[in-house]
C-alpha cells in the first residue's frame, strides 16, 4: 500500500470513552493527485508521482506547468513519489485520507526543525565538565577528541559541534487514533517531526 502527503497542523488531545487523555498530532491530508505513473517497462521500476495542495500560477515554472497539464491536474505545492506493488493507478486519480481507515499504525516522515549550529551538549547530549575545581573555561567543551601521535588525526564521524536539525526524520509505528475523511484529517498518537504547516509523508507502518 502506498502512502500520502499531508501537512502537520499541530498537536492537541482527544479523550477515550474512559476519560483517558491521548496526545495526538493532527495531519491534514488533502486529496493526493496522481501526476505520473511509472512502469517497469518505461522507467525500470513501478511507482506513482503525486502532488497535493495548490500553488500560485506565477510560482509555477514552465516545465512544471507542462507536467501538470499533461496529467490533467491542478498545480500542487510539490511532487512526491511512492513505489507501487501491483496496485493500479491512473493519471489524474485522487487518493484520499480514507485509505487509512483500516490501518492501525503508520510511519511519518518529515523534516525536523532546524536548530542552527549547536554544541556537543545540546547536539549529542554530552556531559558537561566540572563547574568549579579549577575549571574556568571548559564547562561545555567536548574534552578529548582523539588519541596521540598515532593515529595523529580525528576519526571521521566523531561527534562534535555542528549543524543540528533540518534533516529528514522518520518516526515509526505511530498509532492511528482517528480518520476524519470529511474534514480530511488524520490523528496519530504522539509527536511527528517538523514545524507546524510543514509537509509530512504518511505510510502504513513497516513494523506493524
UniProtKB/Swiss-Prot annotation:
GO cellular component, one term: cytosolic large ribosomal subunit
Membrane-crossing residue ranges in chain numbering: none
GO BP, sorted A to Z: translation
PROSITE patterns xref list: RIBOSOMAL_L3
Keyword Ribonucleoprotein: yes
Highest taxon above the source species: Bacteria
Keyword ATP-binding in annotation: no
SUPFAM superfamilies, per the entry: Translation proteins
Pfam families: Ribosomal_L3 (PF00297)
UniProt PTM: Methylated by PrmB.
Primary role: One of the primary rRNA binding proteins, it binds directly near the 3'-end of the 23S rRNA, where it nucleates assembly of the 50S subunit.
UniProt-listed PANTHER family: 50S RIBOSOMAL PROTEIN L3, LARGE RIBOSOMAL SUBUNIT PROTEIN UL3C
Protein name: Large ribosomal subunit protein uL3
Species whose genome carries this gene: Actinobacillus pleuropneumoniae serotype 5b (strain L20)
Top-level taxonomy: Bacteria, Pseudomonadati, Pseudomonadota, Gammaproteobacteria, Pasteurellales
Gene that encodes it: rplC
